């Protein structure tokens, strides 16, 4: 009963796509435009605590600590010596020029919105020198020698080639705020006039989150592009016609855009699990297009007219595709039950993506086939005839 009902629905879809292919194309394109706009609202999520169950006592306590005592994330700014050809280069991190630059950097960081406090072990040297930076390295050494050994070890490393500045941020899981804070911190670092022979690098959890954000976006673009090119090459080898090779790929590409739109609409973030969703959907969804195209070509070789070949391909292939989609979606939706939010997000996105592949392939691909057969191919033949 259910199968018969599905076959009847598929038959109507096939007739609509065959009789009004341009209208079907227009409908799909309009939806795709809105999905593309929604996809721009997808947020990146690199906060480790957001990837864990939010009702866990450890995570709840973390949020309480942030609310009561401010930021818990530390940006560690490492100031260290580096090779330099300059005759004026720094050879000892205790150089007063370095200390003055550190003091200036600290003062500038305090004005960054989102930085709650800034501290450096070097501060104690300034305090011991009546609140000003010593003018010569010998004074710095004298102050250090008068300090207890445990304090002295926390200011510089053993060979006096490195020290750190710690900046505390209250950005927490707010991804946009953290990215803005890191941009401002890096800008302050660039503006600070450190002498030659000194390298300044921000590290710690916030900088690593920014790096992860950049790498996720880069990986998403790269893997999707590589997957797209690889699939296109295989389709060209299989179908041996450029136009027929592109057609099964277009619905899957549109499904990827729809998936991005759904992520923006449902507030599903781009995280470590969902970053590769584009290539994943391409790999899973292209099967549907290949099966439908192959069945259509098979029916045409038997001598069937376009309308009958489209109907047979959509109905016969469509029922199998819908069954395959249902089983795949159930498998992906099982991930929604996972305690890790990012695994649940992956399950949701994969289920949406493969469902969109099915819908777009069964509606748009028949319309594209009809447009190719009835409009594009005759036009190409006429153009070839005119040139001859």
From Swiss-Prot:
One of its GO terms (cellular component) is plasma membrane. Keywords: Cell membrane, Membrane, Transmembrane, Transmembrane helix. The chain crosses the membrane at residues 22-42, 219-239, 246-266, 273-293, 320-340, 351-371. It is found in: Cell membrane. The keyword Nucleotide-binding does not apply. This is Putative membrane protein MJ1562. It is a multi-pass membrane protein. InterPro entries: MMPL_dom, Mycobact_MmpL, SSD.
